[in-house]
Design a protein with these regions (language model features):
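Cross-family detector of peptidyl-prolyl cis-trans isomerase
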Residues: 2-133
Length: 133
């Protein structure tokens, strides 16, 4: 009986370890900070319609946009170029309700030109983002 309980607990722990495994190479490259763990099971795939709550800042902390201010998550189709590359890459790695902070290098954000007079040219950006659905 103890052997069955031990094996059951071991399998549960192994399952949890697999579900919460992160991509160390990606996390190092994009300086990912985990704020809240997600369910570890539900990941979006290319072509999925997703909803993300986010706050975007310049690296000096100046906020340029936030879905929280509008009380409405941002929706887009993952992996089809509707958002900056850093977003497609980051959101694809999030599980449901996971929240991270990620630093997006300018070449995977708004590039050499910046955007809308708010984001300067060659600006690396910081996003806190949470996958809602």
């Amino acid at each position: 009986m103890l052997k069955v309980i031990f094996l059951s607990l071991l399998l549960i722990n192994l399952g949890l370890a697999v579900e919460t495994t992160h991509d160390p190479e990606f996390e190092k490259k994009f300086q990912v900070t985990h704020i809240k763990e997600g369910d570890g099971k539900t990941f979006p795939k290319k072509g999925d319609r997703v909803s993300v709550h986010y706050t975007g800042t310049l690296l000096d902390g100046k906020k340029f946009d936030s879905s929280y201010d509008r009380n409405s998550p941002f929706q887009f189709t993952l992996g089809v170029g509707q958002v900056i590359k850093c977003w497609d890459m980051s959101v694809a790695r999030l599980s449901l309700r996971e929240k991270i902070k990620v630093i997006c290098p300018y070449n995977l954000a708004y590039g050499e030109r910046g955007a809308g007079g708010v984001i300067p040219p060659k600006a690396d950006l910081a996003f806190e983002m949470e996958l809602i659905i």
